Amino acid sequence: PITRKQIETALLTLKKVELNTTEQKELNFYLQEYKNIEGTDTAQLKAVQKDANQRLRGLYLHQKDFYLNVDPMGSLMRITSQGNSFTQMSHGLSFWGQAKQFSFQFYYKDYTENGNGMEAFRIASPEKSIIRLYNPTVTSQNFSEVRGSVSYSWKKGSISLGKDHLNWGYGENGKIVLDNKVSSYPLIRLDYHPTKWMQFNYTHAWLNSNIIDSNALYTAGVGAGSGELRVQYIPKYMATHSLVFKPMKGLHIAIGESVVYSDKTDIGFYIPVNFFKVYDNNRSNYNINAGSNGQFFIQASSRNQIKNTHLYGSMFIDEIRVASIFNRAKSRNQLGYTLGGSITDLFLPYLTLGTEYTRVNPFVYTNLVAAQNYTQYDRVMGDWMGNNFDRMMLFAKYNPIPKLNLYARYQSIRKGGQGTIAEQYLAEPQPPFLFDLQSKRKDWFVQFKYEWINNFYLLGSFESIDYTYKNENVHPAIQSGQTIQLGISYGIR
C-alpha cells in the first residue's frame, strides 16, 4: 500500500503541469481528499462539517502536529448471478490521522448477505475471500473485514505494524506475486528509499494455515457448548523483501524473494537483508522435509518511454532447475509470468486500450507441507486462478467525464488439473502444461463507477460467462450465465 503523503505529493506535481478543464476538475476533487491541512495552535473539533479542503467529514480534529479524521462507511448492493439473487449490506467506520512522525489508520466493515447464490458467486471468482461469522445458512451469512496500522516515518523511509493486504506487481484481473483478494493478515513492514533511484521493502506476516494442529489439542473444560477441546492451528508465516531500481525516467525494474514457513517463528526471517533461500537450506540441513517454501520474483515496467504507452512483465519462480530449463525430460519449471501493455489517448482522449497474457505452470504455489502452501486461509496469495492455467485478456478504460470510470474486459481462460504431491515432486518428466484439462472459460465484463462526492460511489457491472467443461460434474455450482451488480457505497473501498 502507498501512503496518503505519496498520493498528495503526486497530485501536487500535477499543479505544475498545464491541464485541460476535465483534468483540472479531477485534480481539485482528489486534492479535497488528500491535500494536507496545516494545523493551528488551537484545536478544531468539528462533526459532520466540511474541513479546510471543503471535504465533508463525519468528524475531524485538527491542530498543530496532530490531526484525526473519522468517517462512517456503508454500502448496499444487489447481486443477481446465474438466476439467483441476494442483497449485500454493510456498515462500518474508518479513521486515520497523524501525530508528527507517527501515523495511524483503521478500517472496519461488517457485511450481511441475504438471498440465494452467495456461495456460487465466489467460486472460481476474483471476488475477495471471506471468513464467515457465526452459523451461516443457505440464504444468509455474515462476515467482516478489519484493517489497521501504526507507522513511524522519517525522511527516507517508514516502519509499520498493522493488519492489511499486500499488492506486488501488475495485473488487470489478478497478480501472480501478491494480490489483495485474500483476507488481510498481521504484518510488520519496512520501506526504505536510500536514493531516488532505489527502493527497498521488507515484510514479515502472520498467516492463517486453517489446519488444526492435532498435537496441540488439550482439554479446555467440560460441558462447553462447542466441545471440551481447545483447538489450535498450525502457525504459518511469510517473509518477503524486494528491491526496486529506477535507472531512468519511466523504467522500473524490481526483484524480490519470499518464503512461507510454518510451525514456529524463526528470527532469521526477521533480518530484512538476509538471503532467505540460502538461510533456509542451512537451517534445514538441506532436508526437504525440514525446509520451507521459497520463491523468487522479478518485474519490469516501462511507462511513457513510448508516448502514452505502458509495457510490463512479471515472473514468479516457485521452483526451477536452471541446468535443465530446456530439457523436457528433466526440467522443473514451476513458474508463472504475466506480459501486458496498454496505450492511452488512442482514438479518444482518456481512452486506454490494452492486452495481457498470464500463464502459471502446474504446481506453482503448492508445497510438500500443506501448511506451507502459498495461501492465506486456503486462498492463493497470488493469482486467484491458482496454478496450471493461462488467461488471455483484452481491456478498455474510459473516463468520459470527471469522476466517471468505465471499464470493459474480454478474457479467455484455460484451467488444468491440480495434480498430486507425488506428481509434483517425483514425476519425471513433469506433467505438461494444462494436463488434465478441467475447463475453458470465456467472459465479457463491463463496469461503471461514479464518485459523486468524495468516497461516495454509484456502482454497476455486468458479466457474461461461458464455461466448457471436460467433465460437467467438476464444478456443478459454476455454470455459464450472467451476473449483474448494482449498488451504492460510501467510504474507502
Locations of the language-model features?
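Outer-membrane beta-barrel channel domains
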Residues: 3-5, 10-252, 257-259, 263, ...
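Exposed, low-structure sequence patches enriched in small/polar residues
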Residues: 143, 246-493
